[in-house]
UniProtKB/Swiss-Prot annotation:
Belongs to the NifH/BchL/ChlL family. It holds the Pfam family Fer4_NifH. This is Light-independent protochlorophyllide reductase iron-sulfur ATP-binding protein. NCBIfam families: DPOR_bchL. InterPro entries: NifH/chlL_CS, NifH/frxC, P-loop_NTPase, Protochlorophyllide_ATP-bd. GO terms for molecular function: 4 iron, 4 sulfur cluster binding; ATP binding; metal ion binding; oxidoreductase activity, acting on iron-sulfur proteins as donors; oxidoreductase activity, acting on the CH-CH group of donors, iron-sulfur protein as acceptor. The keyword Protein biosynthesis does not apply.
Amino acid sequence: MNIPLRIGGCASGPGCGDGEGSVQVATDPLLAIETAKVFAVYGKGGIGKSTTSSNLSAAFSKLGKRVLQIGCDPKHDSTFTLTKRFVPTVIDVLESVNFHAEELRAEDFIFEGYNGVMCVEAGGPPAGAGCGGYVVGQTVKLLKAHHLLEDTDVVIFDVLGDVVCGGFAAPLQFADRTLIVCANDFDSIFAMNRIVAAIASKAKNYKVRLGGVIANRSAELDQIDNYNNRVGLKTMAHFRDLDAIRRSRLKKSVIFEMDPSPEILAVQAEYMHLAETLWAGTEPLDAMPLKDREIFDLLGYD
């Protein structure tokens, strides 16, 4: 089963109509994830997507759900707090068998973490070469081949930075909802606007829709609220800039493993509420991105 690279326009089918002259990774329709709720987590680089994704995975697991988290970043640190270590990536293990995928066992690339959360790190191609979308496609292909998606309730893709090229937008082809992690500042909101544009493009041909915003490392929400009200987004959860959250990552722990304190318990409750809301189902948001100049004007820049 090949994962072809589709360049430029095409007549019809998945991967088409995503923008004239664009380079898109067209995923085989047989790789669709149909048995689980699938979320793709995006946001500005360094905004805390991996911490957010891992804590959300843990929250889903505490609801009794069978969870799979897929890290889509060459740094392969998405599942670090769930597994307490850096696990081998799919690309690493494929390279070890000269890319003969049939020689791999499930335990070579999938690892159990906190409270039974299953963890995979897709990894990425060498710097300056290859395509991240191909890596994501091959990861899902392996999971399907080993029947690892059949008993899964929730899949979370934790995606590299705010890159929304045809490659790292590939998880959008599998997702039901996209969650955007954002801080209450211009750079984060500017990145969020680009992600909103990518979702609007992908939604023409795939089932993915915007789920909402996860405000992170932010005392206030005024800038996020201004943007949300303008484009049609909603904030689903709000996590302040707390030292306790930073310490949890330094301790290789999800937030539910930290010693209880009022602020820790409040963060845990917010993650549980977010997981419950997402599991119950959310209405898709039909947000429309702003032009760059409009964002400057909206947020008070001359």
